[in-house]
């Protein structure tokens, strides 16, 4: 009983921790121009995804950071990118693609300094990185910036005929708002080949997928310093942990793709998610799930739909996957972060009055620790 009362404040702060022990979710919460829903499921031994929503009376900011090689880079981006963005917004007097790029550049530069400071004690930090997806809604403008293969997909009203050519009925249309920087796409491979005409191994098909230098699938990120700064990959200290990578120049960048457009009345919602979701669901399938179901818990519903698909591919049930422990579960699906932002155009002015200050919602750094026996033991030891 006492343990349960200890957990109640955790649930109020972080959301619900039920059913799937590796899933966390917050069903519904207001932002400056609507509601949002967020859910995360952990597959790796340490959660490598991070997600956050920051809302003020005048703007909403969304971040999804999908780490690789470890959780350090995504956690770093989670703590540093929005402070940089806020600083440049204040300096420049507003949000713009240039301001967003400055924030990405500053975050990359700060992480590089961290790697240099930590290098001798932890050389592996040069091999960690993170995809970075950011959305910003201010007034009637939407900005989406991306590094890597997390994705933002907007759902907007469309019309179509009912069955057998019947009356027009309201449908939802998926509009991709971000650019995937993954060498699975032919245009990304071509871009790399054009940039590295003297390197016949710049993109290699290995272990069933295309990879840069046979190592990594994404071409843009925060971190991955050893693939951006050749001196790190050549250092004997680093080579104790990772095989040397012969580089003449950087093979990855931190140059974000940025898109901005005015929001329209037919724009209903935006799904921001790490690639763990998009590996299992198409853009159209995802927006139809959101369109056809209640708002509360919709991010959790999307995550569960993805997990059902992952289970089906292995001729399993989702209930079977739920029983698999962290780490081993990564063989069945990736960490998944989903944030659904609803756009209530007519309610924007009333929302301003309800949100009198900044409100930040972040997914837990590690979900397993919030659900585990170790967490219960820790609470008992403090009691």
Where are these regions (language model features)?
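PP2C/PPM-type serine/threonine phosphatase catalytic core
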Residues: 1-383
């Amino acid at each position: 009983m006492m343990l349960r009362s200890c957990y109640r404040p955790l649930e109020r702060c972080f959301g619900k921790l039920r059913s799937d022990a590796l899933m966390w979710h917050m069903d519904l919460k207001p932002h400056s121009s609507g509601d949002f829903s967020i859910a995360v499921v952990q597959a790796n031994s340490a959660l490598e995804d991070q997600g956050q929503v920051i809302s003020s009376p005048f703007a909403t900011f969304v971040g999804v950071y999908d780490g690789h090689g470890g959780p350090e880079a995504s956690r770093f981006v989670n703590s540093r990118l929005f402070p940089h963005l806020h600083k440049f917004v204040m300096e420049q007097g507003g949000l713009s693609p240039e301001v967003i790029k400055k924030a990405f550049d500053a975050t990359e530069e700060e992480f590089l300094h961290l790697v240099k400071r930590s290098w001798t004690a932890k050389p592996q930090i040069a091999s960690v990185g993170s995809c970075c997806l950011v959305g910003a809604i201010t007034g009637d403008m939407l900005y989406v910036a991306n590094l890597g293969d997390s994705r933002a997909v907007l759902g907007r009203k469309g019309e179509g005929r009912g069955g057998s050519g019947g009356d027009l009925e309201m449908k939802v249309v998926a509009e991709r708002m971000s650019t995937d920087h993954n060498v699975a796409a032919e245009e990304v491979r071509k871009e790399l080949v054009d940039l590295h005409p003297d390197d016949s191994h710049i993109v290699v098909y290995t272990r069933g997928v295309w990879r840069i230098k046979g190592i990594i699938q994404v071409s843009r990120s925060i971190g991955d310093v050893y693939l951006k700064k050749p001196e790190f990959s050549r250092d004997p200290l680093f080579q104790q942990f990772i095989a040397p990578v012969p580089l003449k120049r950087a093979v990855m960048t931190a140059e974000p793709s940025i898109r901005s457009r005015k929001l329209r009345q037919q724009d209903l919602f935006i799904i921001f998610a790490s690639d763990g979701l998009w590996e299992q669901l198409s853009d159209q399938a995802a927006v139809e799930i959101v369109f056809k179901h209640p708002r509360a818990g919709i991010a959790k519903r999307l995550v569960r739909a993805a997990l059902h698909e992952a289970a089906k591919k292995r001729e399993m049930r989702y209930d079977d996957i739920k029983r698999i422990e962290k780490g081993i579960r990564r063989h069945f699906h990736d960490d998944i972060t989903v944030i659904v932002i609803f756009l209530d155009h007519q309610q924007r002015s009333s929302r301003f009055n309800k949100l009198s200050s900044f409100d930040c919602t972040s997914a837990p750094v590690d979900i397993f620790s919030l659900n585990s026996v170790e967490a219960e033991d820790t609470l008992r030891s403090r009691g």
